[in-house]
């Protein structure tokens, strides 16, 4: 058994980022964690005799010379009433990088070892404080990209997914119990009712969960939105406007963006992966040509393209080519920018004459924000097919591990239904039902292997 699964030793890790900040949290867990920590805490006698769920003020002391290292607040937990189910100490110290190093070094000198990524959550699972669906929900909460995915993860943390999987499992178990009675007591078919309807209802519930994974992928992956156009048309200004901060360099010099810049923003619960591309033009050198080739590739792969045109200037050769080639492309929104300047009528008239869908043409100014609200409304309309209406109480599958097990369980149910139709022996039905129950048990962690747990928890961040 690997060190990852040993629970007899005492572990420590920084639970907050290793950066300068107002505060940091250093957490520890283990049977001897309180007594070991008390050796480096100024109020050690009070700590050793304290009850669980208590807070203590004092100083971390250097174990060699007794000097004060930092002023801290200590949260003390006693088994089994802690996250890990073990005695545990959480130290809130000042967020000094130097101080953090000193404190953790003192922990290590006192007999602790550095925790592996995810080891605290693993100990919570092994102590049956949480199931695997809750463990994965913790990971999803930490790495949520949008408000929607965060809320869905919180719902799973409350146990909603476990309850759903457990209900399906109980239905299969009821079916298995009825079949087992038939096999064990050799009763006739008419003497016992086999609840075949439970298999059909379980199939429907599994299908809903499987479909929910596709919904989650759409929410989590986001919509690829590419800003394209000739040099100095205002793409970078629009990029910064979407982000509500400066990420792209904005200047009056044409061609400031040589490759592309990527960032994300959220609109109405939908994640947008935004790309500010190099201006389309005849490149003078190899590096610029590579950037423009990448821009063209991004345009082809995007869910939505905003082609920005400087309406105060003449159209470029690349503008003419792009407009003519994409005038009927429904995923491209043509934006005439710089309407705060004197409008070039020939540019405006040409674009209006070519773009077949006039609603796909918007006039804006990134300088005074005129037309920006109309642009947002048009983006909402164009990506309405990406919009997924999900209630915060809906149960969504977001883990590839869970998805694979659900698909396996679903395939087993289809096989079981086929055998029921063919009226195969009941012992074969019982075997398939047992396999489905085991498969569902793997989702919640009631059935699990060390290799699966090792791989899953090591994807967690350190200190969690």
Swiss-Prot record:
GO biological process: tRNA methylation; tRNA wobble uridine modification
Positions of K(+) binding: 251
A family per Pfam: MMR_HSR1
Broad class of enzyme this protein falls into: hydrolase
Assembly and binders: Homodimer. Heterotetramer of two MnmE and two MnmG subunits.
Keywords from the UniProt entry: Cytoplasm, GTP-binding, Hydrolase, Magnesium, Metal-binding, Nucleotide-binding, Potassium, tRNA processing
Chief location bin: cytoplasm
Binding site for GTP: 232-237, 251-257, 276-279
InterPro entries in alphabetical order: G_TrmE, GTP-bd, GTP-bd_TrmE_N, GTPase_MnmE, MnmE_dom2, MnmE_helical, P-loop_NTPase, Small_GTP-bd
Native species: Borreliella burgdorferi (strain ZS7)
Disulfide bonds listed in the record: none
GO MF term list: GTP binding; GTPase activity; metal ion binding
Organism placement in taxonomy: Bacteria, Pseudomonadati, Spirochaetota, Spirochaetia, Spirochaetales
Matches recorded under SUPFAM superfamilies: P-loop containing nucleoside triphosphate hydrolases
Record's subcellular location: Cytoplasm
Protein name: tRNA modification GTPase MnmE
Domain TrmE-type G: 222-384
Binding locations of Mg(2+): 236, 257
């Amino acid at each position: 058994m690997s060190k990852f699964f040993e629970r007899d030793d005492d572990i420590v890790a920084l639970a907050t980022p290793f950066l300068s900040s107002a505060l940091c949290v250093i957490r520890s867990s283990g049977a001897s964690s309180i007594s070991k920590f008390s050796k480096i805490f100024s109020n050690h006698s009070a700590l050793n005799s304290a009850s669980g769920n208590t807070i203590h003020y004092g100083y971390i002391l250097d174990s060699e010379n007794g000097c004060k290292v930092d002023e801290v607040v200590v949260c003390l937990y006693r088994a089994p009433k802690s996250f890990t189910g073990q005695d545990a100490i959480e130290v809130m110290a000042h967020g000094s990088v130097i101080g953090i190093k000193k404190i953790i070094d003192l922990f290590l000198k006192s007999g602790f070892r550095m925790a592996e990524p995810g080891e605290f959550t693993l100990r919570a699972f092994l102590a049956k404080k949480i199931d695997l669906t809750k463990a994965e929900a913790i990971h999803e909460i930490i790495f949520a990209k949008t408000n929607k995915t965060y809320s869905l993860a919180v719902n799973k943390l409350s146990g909603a997914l476990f309850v759903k999987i457990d209900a399906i499992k109980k239905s299969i178990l009821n079916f298995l119990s009825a079949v087992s009675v038939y096999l064990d007591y050799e009763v006739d078919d008419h003497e016992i009712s086999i609840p075949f309807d439970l298999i059909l209802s379980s199939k429907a519930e599994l299908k809903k969960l499987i479909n929910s994974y596709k919904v989650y992928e759409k929410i989590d992956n986001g919509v690829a939105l590419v800003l394209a156009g000739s040099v100095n048309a205002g793409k970078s200004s629009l990029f910064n406007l979407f982000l509500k901060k400066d990420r792209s360099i904005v200047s009056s010099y044409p061609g400031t963006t040589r490759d592309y810049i990527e960032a994300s923003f959220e609109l109405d619960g939908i994640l947008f992966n935004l790309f500010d591309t190099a201006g389309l033009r005849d490149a003078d050198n190899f590096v610029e040509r590579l950037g423009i080739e990448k821009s063209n590739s991004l345009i082809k792969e995007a869910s939505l393209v905003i082609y920005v045109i400087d309406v105060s200037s003449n159209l470029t050769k690349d503008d003419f080519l792009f407009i003519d080639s994409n005038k009927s492309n429904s995923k491209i929104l043509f934006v005439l920018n710089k309407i705060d300047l004197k409008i070039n009528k020939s540019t405006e008239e040409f674009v209006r004459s070519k773009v077949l869908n006039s609603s796909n043409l918007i006039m804006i100014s990134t300088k005074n924000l005129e037309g920006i609200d109309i642009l947002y409304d048009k983006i909402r309309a164009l990506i309405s097919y990406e919009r997924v209406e999900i209630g915060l109480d809906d149960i969504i599958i977001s883990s590839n591990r869970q998805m694979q097990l659900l698909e396996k369980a679903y395939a087993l149910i289809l096989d079981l239904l086929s055998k029921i139709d063919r009226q195969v022996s009941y012992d074969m039905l019982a075997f398939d039902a047992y396999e489905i129950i085991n498969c569902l048990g793997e989702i919640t962690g009631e059935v699990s292997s060390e290799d699966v747990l090792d791989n899953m928890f090591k994807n967690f961040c350190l200190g969690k």
